[in-house]
Amino acid sequence: MAAGKFASLPRHMPVNHQFPLASSMDLLSSKSPLAEHRTEAYPDVSIHGTLPRKKKGPPPIRSCDSASHMGTLPHSKSPRQSSPLTQDLILEKPLPDWKGDSFAFRDPYLLDPTLEYVKFSKERHIMDRTPERLKKELEEELLLSSEDLRSHAWYHGRIPRQVSENLVQRDGDFLVRDSLSSPGNFVLTCQWKNLAQHFKINRTVLRLSEAYSRVQYQFEMESFDSIPGLVRCYVGNRRPISQQSGAIIFQPINRTVPLWCLEERYGTSPGRGREGSFAEGRPDVVKRLSLTTGGIQARDHSLPRGNLLRNKDKSGSQPACLDHVQDRKAATLKAHQSESHLPIGCKLPPQSPSVDTSPCPNSPVFRTGSEPTLSPALVRRFSSDARAGEALRGSDSQLCPKPPPKPCKVPFLKVPPSPSPWLNSEANYCELNPAFAVGCDRGAKLLSQALDSHEMLLTAKQNGASGPRNSGINYSILDGDDQGRHWDPLAVQTDEGQEDETKFVPPVMETVSSFRPNDFESKLLPPENKPLETAMLKHAKELFTNHDARVIAQHMLSVDCKVARILEVSEDMKRSMGVSSGLELITLPHGRQLRLDIIERHNTMAIGIAVDILGCTGTLENRAGTLNKIIQVAMELKDTMGDLYSFSAIMKALEMPQITRLEKTWTALRHHYTQTAILYEKQLKPFSKILHEGRESTYVPASSVSVPLLMPLVTLMERQAVTFEGTDMWEKNDESCEIMLSHLATARFMAEASESYRMNAERVLADFQPDEEMTEILKTEFQMRLLWGSKGAEVNQNERYDKFNQILTALSRKLEPPSGKQAEL
């Protein structure tokens, strides 16, 4: 075979007739060897109709030799003359001037001209591909629904494992691809710790009823209805994909070409070869429409299965099998025929064992339109990956051709209409428990009994007894031994004389604070006292000075655990809260009062520590010593006690503007207590910043925390109109939205790990012997009475904070008067 365009001609393909070998120059010769054959025995075949008859000259040449390649024959050495055999043909591509080429004889087994033209059109269409066209097709894929996997650029389709490993280069890079070893499943490829890792996305099918099912995806813990939802959760929350690897994904690797191009590039298109698959994946490739059943059955095996390339065209009542027959104008249909009744004879895709299908009709003509469904209210969820790329017959309403079984005609459990909350007008066959309709005879016997027990049924429901579910999920898959049981209204009987201990008690919505300063019985304070009494301040300072920093930290932890309801929570309190710990209660709507109490104690504690520092009217060394003792207590709370709540209160006091402006006091601390000053600057301040930026889970092990950081969460949920401290420092950060999300995620973890915090607190306070006076001065009621007096403690919170802010400013200026250049507070 000669080089050039003749190289694309296939070899050894049998046809109906054999011709003698002839040179291409014989087409221009008047003495063609083909003249010996009678042309009447070989009817002409042409893609544009019949060739013009030859009036004079040599016998006509078959169109398969002269016109099948559409002007691809080479020039002769002499200037080519227009032949009467080819003058009416349309050249689709200008011919180059080939000179000096030598031509060999043709293969006697020539391809049918119609099929050869289709193959030539495919190859030419591929050669005409431009980056603009690919970009446009990629944009069309990305504009699909967000729940469609193809609309996400991080989905790369059927690419090999090695290729995906080469795409992820940095820690956090990830992409999703089809599993080549397990068709129908998906794999997440990412890089973590400079190592490419592959995680199979587990696919679980939940049976909602006999005829319907739902697909969910998960890695280890939480499951999702779609893969995009799964990826959004793990990327947004920076959640490790697995506990063993700890891999975190946050940087998607996006594809730059359409999915079909990736499959053809790496040769991973399922069920077809490399040569023909490149064009079959394109929607605008010219294809011949055959109206014969035999031709389509031969072509049916080449249809792609298992990919997501063409699902976007299968909608409505348009037959999906016509996706592979694009050139509809090529077929001549009669007036009474429509495209929906073309005898395409496509086979149904293989169904999963859990879904029953009816056999495909033998007739090549069948209905492809929509059919009404029995359950219009039920949203059928079919994952795009389970049936992707398969030729579907008719619209999506025929994916489950077998309807659910009809109920028994005897309404053996039918009761008169009632306003029961579980009755719903949208109930359908899927809501029926199959165990109900074991036999119609049994149902007929129970009919009269059920009608008589209707009043008892309503009474039982008011008492909290459960009836038949009206939800889309059949929980029988979770009830291993109770699958055969069904709800019997006659069995719902309760003794009015006996009280059910397991009866649900609604939680109590608390409206009054647990801090009652005027009802507080104190051994140190009189029944009525004035704000900031000197004798009380001096006695409290002596107690604070005489005790060790660790002992003070233990007392603070003990009081904090009682206020936050971590320790000493009675059963009655648990029943009224609805939960077992205050750490879970503060995340719930009816925990508002506890959140306000936590804010009150935190602010009161911070103000009391500031007063302890600013109330030292003695020498500069005394103030530095008090500051040193407070920093030591903060270190004990952080390292030994794990009480991050009181730790944040101390750090808040030390970072108040009235304290930070005391330059002489901080200088004296550096001179006399150098090690303490270094610990404060190098450890405590950076650690406090990490806590308020929501990164404590990275630097603080959960096993060492007794009381977590509560203030960011309760502040977000109970923001006051006027706060003592103004906005928190993390709210002034450029990444405040991400920090807020991190605090909310930490709150969820707090509620889940409340039992772990309780055990840690009990372990730390195992050998603790409390001192009554030290415990009293650390209680919130005592501090409120000491700071605002017996009358002022009952005043509005915002008013109290605003007035005390002015008092602290005055005390600070009295200790160290501002210079002329110093800006006023």
From Swiss-Prot:
GO MF terms, alphabetically ordered: guanyl-nucleotide exchange factor activity; kinase binding; phosphotyrosine residue binding
Domain of life from the UniProt record: Eukaryota
Keywords from the UniProt entry: Acetylation, Cell junction, Cytoplasm, Guanine-nucleotide releasing factor, Methylation, Phosphoprotein, SH2 domain
Region of interest: Disordered: 40-84, 300-320
Domain SH2 as annotated: residue spans: 154-253
Site (Required for interaction with NEDD9) residue list: 748
Modified residues (N-acetylalanine): 2
Post-translational note: Phosphorylated on tyrosine residues.
An example Gene Ontology CC term for this record: cytoplasm
InterPro entries per record: Ras_GEF_dom_sf (IPR023578), RASGEF_cat_dom (IPR001895), RASGEF_cat_dom_sf (IPR036964), SH2 (IPR000980), SH2-Ras-GEF_adapter (IPR051853), SH2_dom_sf (IPR036860), SH2_SHEP1/BCAR3/NSP1 (IPR044102)
Residues the record lists as Omega-N-methylarginine modifications: 442
Record keyword Transmembrane helix present: no
Modified residues (Phosphoserine): 32, 78, 83, 182, 290, 358, 363, 375, 471
Region called Mediates the interaction with BCAR1/p130CAS, residue ranges: 744-748
PROSITE patterns: RASGEF_CAT (PS50009), SH2 (PS50001)
N6-methyllysine sites (modified residues): 334
Biological process, per Gene Ontology: endothelin receptor signaling pathway; epidermal growth factor receptor signaling pathway; insulin receptor signaling pathway; lens morphogenesis in camera-type eye; positive regulation of cell population proliferation; positive regulation of GTPase activity; positive regulation of MAPK cascade; small GTPase-mediated signal transduction
Positions of disulphide bridges: none
Domain notes: The SH2 domain mediates interaction with tyrosine-phosphorylated proteins. However, not involved in the binding to phosphorylated BCAR1. Required for cell cycle progression in response to INS/insulin. Required for regulation of EGF-induced DNA synthesis.
Function per UniProt: Acts as an adapter protein downstream of several growth factor receptors to promote cell proliferation, migration, and redistribution of actin fibers. Specifically involved in INS/insulin signaling pathway by mediating MAPK1/ERK2-MAPK3/ERK1 activation and DNA synthesis. Promotes insulin-mediated membrane ruffling. In response to vasoconstrictor peptide EDN1, involved in the activation of RAP1 downstream of PTK2B via interaction with phosphorylated BCAR1.
Name of the featured protein: Breast cancer anti-estrogen resistance protein 3 homolog
Naturally occurring in which organism (per UniProt): Rattus norvegicus
Lineage: Eukaryota, Metazoa, Chordata, Craniata, Vertebrata
